[in-house]
Amino acid sequence: MDISKIMEIIVKLFGSKKSEVKSNDKPPKKAQDIAKKFEKTTGKATKIWKVGDKLSPHFSYDEMTRSQTAERNSIDNTPKIENVENLIALCENVLEPVRVHFKKPATVTSGFRCIELNRKIGSTDRSQHTKGEAADFVINGSPTVTDVWKWIIDSDLDFDQVIQEFGRWIHVSYKRSGVNRHKCSIAKKVDGKTRYFHYTEEQIEKGEYEL
């Protein structure tokens, strides 16, 4: 489909060629409605969000969706509207409170991953990254990865899963629907293989875990 046809569809749907999304703002509900209409008409993931648009005060659409692997392999990692809504919920309910508490930038190393990208890096189709429900991140310097992991668990935050991975980064997830499990784990390499050790919140509170 050439660009003129695409513009005709957009004008018919929205009545204007101007974007409803303001840079640095959380996409308004009208923009989300527009995105849903665009998806329904074209069958493609929406591109209504752009670089610089905020999903929460300290986290942007760009950093939650970008991937060097996707860029190197020409993979379109554009999320669908429900994936973006999941990312917003993840930012608002977990990542933003972590950023505010530690008062240091949190670097997202992996956020949303489409199925093609997820398979490219060797992950399973069941990964919550493919739904926009999960992110891997680090806070540089102090506190340690374990400090952040433990704070999330000890806090009143609602989360589905939090994993301290190899002492290098945190994997955290949040579900908008259903019950968040509060699953707490540590990932380690044992005899060259990745193993996950699971703990209850009570065990972690008592210090009954091994790094």
Give a label for each model feature.
Residues 125-146:
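Acidic, His- and aromatic-enriched active-site or binding-groove loops in soluble protein domains
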Residues 109-110, 128-129, 161-165:
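Short beta-strand
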Residues 90-94, 117, 133, 144, ...:
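Amphipathic alpha-helical interface surfaces
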Residues 3-101, 188-211:
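Extracytoplasmic cell-surface/polysaccharide-interacting catalytic and binding patches
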Residues 106, 135, 170:
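A broad, low-specificity signal marking well-ordered, structured residues that form hydrophobic/aromatic
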Residues 122-126, 187-190:
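Short, surface-exposed, charged loop/turn segments at secondary-structure junctions
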Residues 95-121:
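Extended, low-complexity, intrinsically disordered C-terminal regulatory tails
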Residues 139-211:
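Catalytic cores and adjacent binding grooves of peptidoglycan-active enzymes
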